[in-house]
């Protein structure tokens, strides 16, 4: 457990993983500048962070985040590099905070909406790419307005597999253009890419020229996310 900015000190002492309390607070309270700063940290450091939406000290996820926010924050925390931590009964949407000294719990019915969201994320992140792949933060430029700062985009790559994640962590619609210029697509000569969203099964065909030249235009409503599996032809 790492609080009060002690993460690097504990890692220097030999701990393998430390809580990412800073990112949790930034996401919970929608401090987008802080979110951007946290995910821009060196990958060598981020690999040692524990990403969480609740633990035995914090409020239950179902209380801390309104139901409409769950899709974006769970996709975000569940697809970042580092350790992904899930508290007992978090997936089921439990709301009663459990003191660690208590040896019994109050039974709560599972929330089907919460279970459905987490099951999709857990199913997607079972794939090797989220454990053995290379992660990159992706730049997003403005497109038509100044809302792109509410979006976070990043990718995972492993051999020919390619995932692109875009999340809107704010309470208003946001749009922008995701650039792959710093990390060109592996299939650079592809005529077309298909972005298959593993959250809602939607498919978005895009020309290879557009992706290489201009990037990917995205628009997400408040607290929505994309978890793309990208294929090429």
Please identify what each model-predicted range represents.
Residues 73-77:
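Structural preference for long, well-ordered alpha-helical segments in enzyme cores
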């Amino acid at each position: 457990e790492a609080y009060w900015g002690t993460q690097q000190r504990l890692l220097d002492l030999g701990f393998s993983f430390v809580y990412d309390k800073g990112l949790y607070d930034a996401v919970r309270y929608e401090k987008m500048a802080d979110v951007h700063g946290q995910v821009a940290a060196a990958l060598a450091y981020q690999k040692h962070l524990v990403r969480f939406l609740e633990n035995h000290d914090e409020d239950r996820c179902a209380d801390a985040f309104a139901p409409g926010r769950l899709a974006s924050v769970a996709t975000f925390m569940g697809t970042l590099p580092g350790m992904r931590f899930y508290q007992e009964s978090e997936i089921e949407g439990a709301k009663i905070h459990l003191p660690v000294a208590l040896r019994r719990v109050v039974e709560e019915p599972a929330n089907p909406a919460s279970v459905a969201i987490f099951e999709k994320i857990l199913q997607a992140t079972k794939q090797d790419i989220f454990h053995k792949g290379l992660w990159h933060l992706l730049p997003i430029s403005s497109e038509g307005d100044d809302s792109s700062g509410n979006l976070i985009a990043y990718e995972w790559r492993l051999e020919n597999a390619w995932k692109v994640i875009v999340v809107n962590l704010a309470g208003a619609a946001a749009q922008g253009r995701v650039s792959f210029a710093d990390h060109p697509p592996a299939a650079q000569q592809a005529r077309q890419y298909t972005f298959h969203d593993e959250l809602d099964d939607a498919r978005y065909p895009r020309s290879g020229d557009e992706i290489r030249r201009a990037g990917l235009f995205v628009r997400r409503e408040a607290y929505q996310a994309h978890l793309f599996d990208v294929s090429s032809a």
